[in-house]
Amino acid sequence: MNYKANIDMKIIRNSIIPFKGFCAINLFGVIFARHEAYLSETVLNHERIHTAQMKELGYVLFYVIYLIEWLVRLLLPGNAYRNISFEREAYNNQRNSFYLERRKSFAMWRK
């Protein structure tokens, strides 16, 4: 099995991270979820895709690029968050449970 498809993630439930209004956030391959949040398979797959992206680029570089892209997209029309390349890949494929088995390297920047 492809290493990208077999991504186990630790889940930490708490009442601080993420902020209210969000159910989960992936920080360095660890899911932080609110106590009351239901983590569907779709949400978990979305976060698995982010973990694959992080491992591919390295955690620090992932966050540097993510932040820069978000700041640039704030100046452009549309939803800055949803238009970040990492988020587009994750949202477009979060319902495909086999996506990580066939994901190509640097898929977030491929058409």
Annotate the PLM regions:
Residues 30, 50, 75-76:
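Residues at structural and domain junctions
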Residues 21-44:
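Short pre-active-site segment immediately N-terminal to the catalytic Zn-binding motif
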Residues 42-54, 90:
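Active-site recognition of the HExxH zinc-binding catalytic motif
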Residues 1-22, 26, 57-111:
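Metalloprotease/metallohydrolase-associated module, dominated by Zn2+-dependent proteases
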Residues 3-5, 9, 37, 44, ...:
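Hydrophobic transmembrane signal anchors and adjacent membrane-proximal interface regions, especially
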